Structures are given as C-alpha cells and as structure tokens.
Amino acid sequence: MIKRIATLYICSLACACSQPDKLFRLLEAEQTGVQFANTVSEGDSLNILNYVYYYNGGGVALADLNGDGLDDIFFTGNETSCRLYLNEGSLHFRDVTREAGLETRDWCTGVTVTDVNSDGRPDLYVCTAGYPDPERRKNKLFVQQELRDGIPVFSDEATARGVADSSYSTQAAFFDFDKDGDQDLYVMNHANQRESVNTPATKKTHGEGASNDHFYVNDGNGRFTEQSFRLGINTEGYGLGLAIGDVNDDGWEDVYVSNDFIYNDLLWINDHGKGFVNLIDSFMNHQSYNGMGCDLADINNDSRLDLIVVDMLPETAEGRKKMIGDLTWSKAELIEQAGYAPQYMRNTLQLAAYGRNPGETTFCEIGQMAGIAATDWSWGPLLADFDNDGWKDLFISNGYYRDIGDKDFIDYTNNLFMFRSREETDRQMIPEIRKQKARRLPNRIFRNKGDLSFDPVSYQWGITQPSCSNGTAYSDLDNDGDLDLVVNNLNETSFIYENLANKNLNNNYLKIKNNNNISISRVRVHAGGHTQEVVAHRERGFMSAVSDVIHFGLGEFARADSVEITLANGKVQKLYQVASGQTIQVNPAEAKTPVRLEKEAIQTWFSAVKAITGLEYVHHDDPFSDFQYQPLLPHRLTGQGPVLATGDLDGDGLDDCFAGGGKAQPGIIYLQKPEGGFVSRPLEVKAPEGKCTDACIFDANGDGLGDLYLTFGGNEWP
C-alpha cells in the first residue's frame, strides 16, 4: 500500500513538472505601481436607476505619450479621476496624472489617441456620459503642449476645436474618411432611458434620435465641424462597440457600430469620401442582440476583415435559465414588422467572403461553429496574436457589478412598478439593487486553431481571476516581443497581465511602428505561405485604444518573405526578406503609389435565370403561430414553403415539374415544351385536407410513364 501511494505521489509530481508554463502572469499592483481602480459609489443622486449604463465601467488607452519608446497607460474613470501612468521600464509605472494636467471630475467612458495638430505628439480624446447636466458631459480633447521633465503636459481644447460633444458618448474614433490628409472624428453615442429600450418602435433614421451618433469633419486647421446629417449618419442606436476598417475592400475606410438592446448594429459603408450608407442588411443575415464591444481583424489569414461582436449569453444551462429574457413569437413578429433585422443573444463572429461581383462582400456568421458564442456578460473582445504563432487569438473581458439581469430580480422589479409610483419604486429599489451580488466572472481567452475554430485556453494561459472587467487593451509594454494586456476593472484594482510567450515559446515576431506623424492604414506580412493583415486603427474592443505599434507573430519562421505597409494616403512601402525579432520604422520616402488592379468577377458554376415562360407559381401559406399552441417546438413546422418534384410526366423526354400548394391551395403541374418554357396543368385529382408536404415523380407501375406520389399533412389547425 505504501509503495502504491509513493508511486502515485511520484507520478503526480511528474505530471505537475510536465505542465507547460502559463502564457500570462497577473502582476501585483505593488510590483507595477499601478493602483488604479474605477470605483462607483452607488449613491442616491447617480445610480443605475437614473443612468442606464452606470455599471459599464471605463476604458484604457496604451500609447507612448512622452516619446521614450515605451507605451504608457491611461485609464478613464467614472466617479474617480482618469489616471496616467508613465512606463518607467521593466513593467513599472509612475502616476503623473496631476503633473500632466489630466485630472477629471466628470463621468469618463471611452478614450482614443490621435495627433490632432500633426505635431508628432500623441493627444487624447476622452468621451463622457453619466450626469444629466450637459455641461458635465462635454467630451474632452487633451492636446499635448510640451514635455516637462519627461512628463507630457496636456490642455483640454475640445471646445476650441469644436469637438466638445455633450451627448451621452461611449467611444470615438479618428480616421481620414475623405482622404484629404487630416483626421476626421466619429463619436458614438447612446441615450439614457430605462423603459422602451427593447420595444419594437418605429426606427428613427432621419437624425432625430436622441442617441444619434455624430460625425465631425476636420476643416484642415485642427478645427472640426459637425456634419452628421449631411454625410448620412442619421440612425439612432445605443452604441457600445466601434470599429474602423475597409470592410468591403474598396480602398475607403468604413465604420461598424455594435448597438445594445433592440437597436440593430450599423455598418456605415464609405461612399468614396462623399458620405456613408448603412448597408448592414446587405452584408449580414443576423447580428448579436445586445451588441457590446466589437473588433475588426482577419482571423483566417485571407486578407479580409472579419468581425467579432460580443453579447451576454451564459455558458451554462443554469446561467441561461436564470438570465435569458422571454421573447415571445408575437413580439418577434412585431420586431420583424418594425423593420429590425434578426438578432440573437450570443456572440457573433462574422467571417468575410467575396461576393459574386467585383467589390462585393458578404459575411457568414460562424460564432457557434468557432466555439466562442457563449462567454457570459462580455464587454471587450480583442483579436490579436498573443502566442506569436501567426494566428489571431481572442481575449474577452467579462463581468457585471450587480446581477440585475437575474430573472427573479426582474420579476420582482416589474411587480414593484405595477403597484407603486415611479418615485416609490425607486426608493425601494436602490437598497435592493445594492444587495444584488456582483457577477464577477473570469475573463476569457481563446487560441486560434487556424481552422476557423478556437480553443478555450483561459486556464492554460493563466487568465482565471474573477472580476468585473470592462475596457481592455494590448501592447508590448516591456518591448520583449509579445503582447501584454491591461484591463480596467470596476470597483477593483486594474489588471496588468505580462505575456510570457517570448520566454516560454519559440515563436518569432515582427513589429511595425509609425514614424512621427506618418499614419499607417494597414500592414500585410507574407511568411511561410500565409498572409497576415492588421488594420492600424487603435479603437478596439470596448471603450479602449490599443498601441499604435503593429504586431505580427511569425511562428517558426525567422523572416518574412515580404512586408507591405499601406499609408493613409494610399502609398505602399514594400520590404523583402525581413528578419524577425525587430521593429520596422515606416519610411514614407520609400512608399510608392500602387497600381490598383480591377477585381475580376468570380466565375461561378451557376447563373441566375431571371424568368422562365410559364413558371409563374406563387405559393400561399396562411399565417399561423406554431409556438402559441406548442411553445416547446425547436422551430416552426408551418410556413416552410412549397414542395417541388421534377420528372417526365408526359413521356416526351423532357423534365416536367410539380409544385405543391399550401393548405387549401391545389398543386400545379408544369409540362415542359420542346421549344422552351412551360405550360401549367391543374392537378386533376381531389387532394386530401391539409398541405402537400412532399412529392416524388417515379414510374410506380412500370409502364414507362412518370407517376406522381404526394403526401399531405401540416401543423395548422383547425
């Protein structure tokens, strides 16, 4: 017995020793010097009852603000001030918020980085929301004035430059939409209302919505003019995710907005600098219902931008039963009748594909197939190569400070509204909300397997700490060749994850860096038979901005066959046989205007036939609600359209056709004519009650003629 125990002990030690090291290591605040915690007090004057996004948290931006070659950390705070931490090397940071002039007293949300005056020094644009007073909701543009003892000093010039937007703003993005050489500004907004956010009301598409986003055109001198309506930005939404990229590969950058609640997402296709058109229904068949953060990146190395949008579907059956709201068939019909596209409460991963014609793009949604559809109450998705193997992995921040999505709590609050006034209800609900436990969840990370699927590797890679995490961003903070992570948590000290890929793995990397105010649009790296592409925009995930140093993992390959750096002005710098393990500086003098080849139409196996003489059949199915009578059905059994069968019914050697009718609709035979086209003949037998559910043409009696076999049934009644 003792020998057996000893053997088991030795085996367990051997197994423990053989376990690979974690990819990420969570650093202690004492080690990094970063003590920031985005705290909210849940007071009587401002809380979830009078601000719908009270628990949505803040963002983080990573950028080299003082030009020392190390990315610094800027956190946004809600009821606490934003904080700036300068990177002192070796993953240690120093709080210089006061010296930098970045202390805030407003409810700050998203943050992005730009160089608004083209002086080569990064500036910060910070969105605000929360407070009912519009004066406290003016967005901030912190323009860098000087370096003082190595500390960047900023001044808020939002009002002077015309971008002090006083809406409820979540995030913003700078990009040159019209290719005139300066950065324009998209500001993503939401409204603040508790009721009716999931009611299928008539869409507001003429700029009249309180939650309409805003677009500011750069006048060329660093000042901006709001021109949303003129440019077609006219549809309401509750924007939580914002991504910029050339979605349809026409050379012009587009805008994707993921919207919360019933509001459909928006895909603003750039009309060659003249404005924008929302074409999401033409590109995607369905979307996430509660669209949170989003990211645009190429997940399968085909040089096409794919899209991830996260939602709040729990992983477990227990979690889903506690959280998922009721969506009745009648409400689903109302939503469809009001013009809303199909939406589902889960993460969606939209895989880009070429359309049939040149310039066309379509998306196939593969979230469930890829294994990333359910990650619970999620916020910020980031697609990046964290293990340097040449494939972009997926990190998702998770958690919500009060579990107000619990169905029992929702039923309780609904009952309160039935019997009390709004004021009485609010007084009673505030203490009840404070009693609700925090939905502290581990953040999730998935390894890209390279076959359109992802492995959940949170435990294996060391991402296991439960938290209420919101904004997150990546950067190589210690310049060792792998991407570290910074996470802004609610009512908890922020996370800094050190990436250990350079120490624990043998994969190579390559980095590309902007040269002062030269703006990169995208970079393509060809290595080992694969082509990777990264869009250079910093706004990713949720309320956050990543480093402007573009990172590629090369796996086992010690060099890249070629590197193509496309600048914002359209010129391309090409490099060949580039050694790994280095950071390339952009050299605009080497960039040349590319010859843009016209895309050839894809040769398809089939072509559409616009009309065939004699085939004018119109199927009719009476509306019927299956779920009203059978609520546990997995899908409708009615409304499935006509049955079709082909075969030679008249012995002339040509295939004829039979189309089965709906309930009380007779089927029709179409006989093919030698000269082309068809002639219709009614079915000369009395059909039984019900709908024709199947049909087959075959020689039943061996006389050489096609016979018609029909089945009847249906789910409609009476």
What are these regions (language model features)?
Residues 1-22:
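Bacterial Sec-dependent N-terminal signal peptides
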